[in-house]
Amino acid sequence: QKTGIPRAAVRRCLYTLSKLGFVYAEDGKNFQLRPRILALGHAWLASTPLARSAQPVLRHLSEMLNESCSIATLDGDDILYIARASSSRIMTIDLDIGSRLPAWATSMGRVLLSHQPEEKLNDMLARVTMIRYTPQTVDSVAKLRAELKRVHQQGYALNDQELEMGLRSLAVPLFNAQGQVQAALNVGVHAGQMTAREMIERVLPELQKAARELTLLLR
C-alpha cells in the first residue's frame, strides 16, 4: 500500500528474494528477513566513498600497530561502523562493518558527540539510557558532559575499559571540507597490551597522522 506496487508484483519480488535466501515465510504469507540480508547493507557501507578510500590507510595503520582500526559515523544515538581493518590479535568484542554501538559509551562516539550542536546533544542525552557496562563506565549525564568537553578540547577520546573490561580504545575526529566532523577513527587494544598512557604516547601520534591523510580524502 505504501509503495503503490501491485500485490502480484510484490509477491514475485518476495519469491525471488526467498530463492536468494534473503527472506523466508514459514506459512507462505508472512515474510521475515534472514541474516543474509545484512550482506547487502555491509556491501553498501563498504562501497561508500569514505569507506572505499579509507581502507588502504586503515590497513597500513593496523599493520603498523598490529591492532584493529575502525571508522564510524554517527547514526541516531549510535555509532555505525563503515570501515575496519582487523589485526591478528583476538578481540573479545566482535565488530564488523555495519556494527552499531551506543555513541555515548565509545571513544568514536564521544569524539562525534563532542562536536554536535548543543541543542542536538541535549536531545540525545535526554533520550539515552546510561548503562554501567563495567565499573569504569561513566555513570551520569553530568560526568559524560564533562568528558565530552574534555574530548573536544584535547582533540581525542580515550575509552579505558568503559564498554568492556580489558578493552581500551583511542579515537580522533575526521573533518570534511567544511571543517565539520564527518566521522571518527579509532584503534582498539587489549588492556594488557598497552597502558592508557602508552596509548597516548605511542598510538595517538600515528592515529592523528592517519586522520590527517583521511581528512584530505574528504576535501
Model feature map: region roles:
Residues 174-177:
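Sensor-regulatory modules in signal-transduction proteins
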Residues 53-61, 125-171, 217:
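Short, basic/aromatic recognition patches
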Residues 16-22, 36, 70, 81, ...:
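Residue-level recognition of specific faces of alpha-helices
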Residues 182-219:
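Juxtadomain coupling helices with adjacent low-complexity linkers
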